């Protein structure tokens, strides 16, 4: 099997050296070239035709975002962004994902060499995922049509959503058309700390419903979406007659914290047939067992179809496990989940 050919673009000579060490330490990939800026990278892309590009967000001569936008228009290819953990860095990274980047890795703030080398397996996994990702499914999505407001639903009704690679844009596409009469939504997207708040704030500006990073102990309200904070699990709990959110630092599940399975299992237990579960694009199997638990508890469950997924891993695993009632295109997810939650349609298996 041929190796994954990687080209790294970063203005830091140290970062280029570290990325080369990391990529070349894995037998299934190789660093074919590095570039100090996008202008040099343009010629190297033509010369080496890499499978995956790693791209620093902030660089001289040409900004990483400007280069990414031009690249996706003229020569689309899988890109993994390399970002700082600052507030500005997280906002720029979210914009990069909107423009078509597949995923991102974060630079440690201290001890760059030791920190990046510690991330070696994670970086390799993101490069492998990017190499297999569907670029056709990851074209920038147009704003979906706003759905008509439906009847106000019981506060017992809620929707749980899980996603990973490609999920930030998929979630935006699902939330943007939702009317204020929507039930509460609990969302777990695999993301590091710092990024989830920026992600929630970005969505809050784009959506009619309120979107925020979830906080421990807060009451779950209709017309609001709650994003699990990075590196912390989110569960649905009860306080008397009301739902509330529980945030905790339990061990990683399926190598993830936050984990979709943790959310889905809690929703199965607390909401049962009053819930709809949705699993979107992502690598791995997180959420499959939890979605089966939701279906067995009477919830209606939806999976994004392969044609519209950047990575079909998580939906495929949930389908194969028998946890999915219906498979739909991303463009139909919002409408279908609202239709099912309004009709109260649920089945037991």
From Swiss-Prot:
EC number(s) recorded for this UniProt protein: 3.1.1.61, 3.5.1.44
GO cellular component term, pick one = cytoplasm
What's an example Gene Ontology biological process for this entry?
A: chemotaxis
Question: What residue stretches are annotated with the Response regulatory domain?
Answer: 5-122
Q: Please outline how this chain is modified post-translation.
A: Phosphorylated by CheA. Phosphorylation of the N-terminal regulatory domain activates the methylesterase activity.
The cross-references to CDD domains, in alphabetical order and at most eight, read:
CheB_Rec, REC_CheB-like
SUPFAM superfamilies in the cross-refs: CheY-like (SSF52172), Methylesterase CheB, C-terminal domain (SSF52738)
Q: Residue ranges of the CheB-type methylesterase domain? A: 152-344
Residues with PTM 4-aspartylphosphate: 56
Principal subcellular localisation of the protein:
cytoplasm
Q: Note the SMART domains from the entry.
A: REC
Annotated GO molecular function terms are: phosphorelay response regulator activity; protein-glutamate methylesterase activity; protein-glutamine glutaminase activity
Annotated compartments: Cytoplasm
Protein function: Involved in chemotaxis. Part of a chemotaxis signal transduction system that modulates chemotaxis in response to various stimuli. Catalyzes the demethylation of specific methylglutamate residues introduced into the chemoreceptors (methyl-accepting chemotaxis proteins or MCP) by CheR. Also mediates the irreversible deamidation of specific glutamine residues to glutamic acid.
| Domain characteristics, as noted in the entry | Contains a C-terminal catalytic domain, and an N-terminal region which modulates catalytic activity.
- The protein depicted here goes by the name Protein-glutamate methylesterase/protein-glutamine glutaminase
Q: Which lineage is the organism of this entry classified under, starting from the top rank?
A: Bacteria, Pseudomonadati, Pseudomonadota, Gammaproteobacteria, Enterobacterales
Its gene name is cheB
């Amino acid at each position: 099997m041929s190796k994954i050919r990687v080209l790294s673009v970063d203005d830091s000579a140290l970062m280029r050296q570290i990325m080369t060490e990391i990529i070349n330490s894995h037998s299934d990939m190789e660093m074919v070239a590095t570039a100090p800026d996008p202008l040099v990278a343009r010629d190297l892309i033509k010369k080496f035709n890499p499978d995956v590009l790693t791209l620093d967000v902030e660089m001289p001569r040409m900004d990483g975002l400007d280069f990414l936008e031009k690249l996706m228009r003229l020569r689309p290819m899988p890109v993994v962004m390399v970002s700082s953990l600052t507030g500005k860095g997280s906002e720029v990274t979210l914009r990069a994902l909107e423009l078509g980047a597949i995923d991102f890795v974060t630079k440690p703030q201290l001890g760059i060499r030791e920190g990046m080398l510690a991330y070696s397996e994670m970086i390799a996994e993101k490069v492998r995922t990017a190499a297999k990702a569907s670029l056709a499914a990851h074209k920038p999505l147009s704003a979906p049509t706003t759905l008509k407001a439906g009847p106000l639903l019981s506060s017992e009704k809620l929707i749980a959503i899980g996603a990973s690679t490609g999920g930030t844009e998929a979630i935006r596409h699902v939330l943007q058309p939702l009317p204020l009469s929507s039930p509460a939504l609990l969302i777990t997207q695999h993301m590091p700390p710092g990024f989830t708040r920026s992600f929630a704030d970005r969505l809050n500006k784009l959506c009619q419903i309120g979107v925020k990073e979830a906080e421990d102990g807060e009451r779950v309200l209709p017309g609001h979406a709650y994003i699990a904070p990075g590196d912390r699990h989110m569960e649905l709990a009860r306080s008397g007659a009301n739902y509330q959110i529980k945030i905790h630092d339990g061990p990683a599940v399926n190598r993830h914290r936050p984990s979709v399975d943790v959310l889905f299992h809690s929703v199965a237990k607390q909401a049962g047939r009053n819930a709809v579960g949705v699993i979107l694009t992502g690598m791995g199997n997180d959420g499959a067992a939890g979605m089966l638990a939701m279906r067995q508890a009477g919830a209606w469950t939806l999976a994004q179809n392969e044609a519209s997924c950047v990575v079909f891993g998580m939906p495929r695993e949930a389908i194969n496990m028998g946890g999915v009632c219906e498979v739909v295109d991303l463009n139909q997810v919002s409408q279908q989940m609202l239709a099912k939650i309004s009709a109260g349609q649920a089945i037991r298996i």
